[in-house]
A protein has these predicted regions:
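Sec-dependent bacterial lipoprotein signal peptides
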Residues: 1-15
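Bacterial signal peptide processing site
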Residues: 18-21
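Compositionally biased, proline/threonine/alanine/serine-rich low-complexity intrinsically disordered stretches
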Residues: 25-54
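N-terminal "mature-domain start" segment
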Residues: 43-85
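Secretory pathway targeting signatures of secreted, lumenal, and periplasmic proteins
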Residues: 67-119, 155-158
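Surface-exposed amphipathic alpha-helical segments
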Residues: 77, 175-207
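Second-shell loop/turn segments in exported
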Residues: 104-111, 136, 185-189
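Signature of long, low-cysteine stretches enriched in small and polar/charged residues
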Residues: 121-171
């Protein structure tokens, strides 16, 4: 079961590559981390509720030193992957375990970040209209604006449900796409929901 989150990541990576290919041909570009009329939606600040804060009480810090990022995670969560472009922690348990999965993708300096992030937002809004997503918003975490969305509870309790935050940043002179995913299966997501939001809002990253 521990390989299931990797399958989810690969599927998302393929969709990202498709969007990247389209956008690289665009003659309109926004500077990395800049805000244009294309992505000027007002962002909500990522502030945890009391329950979400309590869910992390007595926890630990998950550090991704290679990418200058860190999270607060609950007690007993353990690191499963720490590579240059992928970072994963998870709670105890089988398919109902909670997962933190973070991916970094290096982008060309000319990549149109404003158009891209707006496309992710619009795509999530379309999924919401189609009944696939029940939460979509511009969300600022640690001073960086991105798009957050949450999938609906799956019809089958053992299917996966994801909460994601997508953003672009400049790190060590490199333009990067940041994908922070919190997931579990349908049953586990409800059980771990306060933890998942708490971990997401705790994101610290250099940008």
């Amino acid at each position: 079961m521990k390989h299931i989150p990797v399958v989810l990541v690969l599927g998302f990576a393929l969709s990202l590559c498709n969007l990247t290919g389209k956008l690289k041909n665009s003659n309109t570009s926004g500077g990395p981390g800049s805000t244009s009329t294309e992505s000027s939606g007002e962002a909500e600040h990522g502030t945890p509720t009391a329950a979400q804060t309590q869910a992390l009480a007595g926890g630990q810090t998950a550090k991704w030193d290679q990418q200058g990022m860190s999270w607060s995670v609950p007690p007993k969560w353990t690191e499963t992957t720490n590579e240059s472009k992928m970072f994963m922690w998870r709670s105890p348990g089988g398919s109902e375990a909670a997962n933190l999965i973070v991916n970094i993708s290096a982008m060309d300096e000319s990549f149109p970040t404003d158009i891209s992030i707006k496309a992710f937002y619009d795509g999530a809004k379309t999924r919401a209209k189609n009944g696939e997503v029940d939460e979509v918003k511009w969300l600022e975490i640690d001073g960086l604006k991105g798009v957050e969305f949450r999938e609906i509870n799956p019809e089958k309790a053992d299917d996966f449900r994801r909460l994601q935050w997508l953003a672009y940043r400049k790190y060590n002179g490199q333009l990067q796409f940041v994908n922070v995913m919190l997931s579990s299966n349908g049953t586990g997501f409800i059980k771990h929901q306060d933890e998942l939001y708490g971990v997401m809002y705790s994101t610290k990253l250099v940008h």
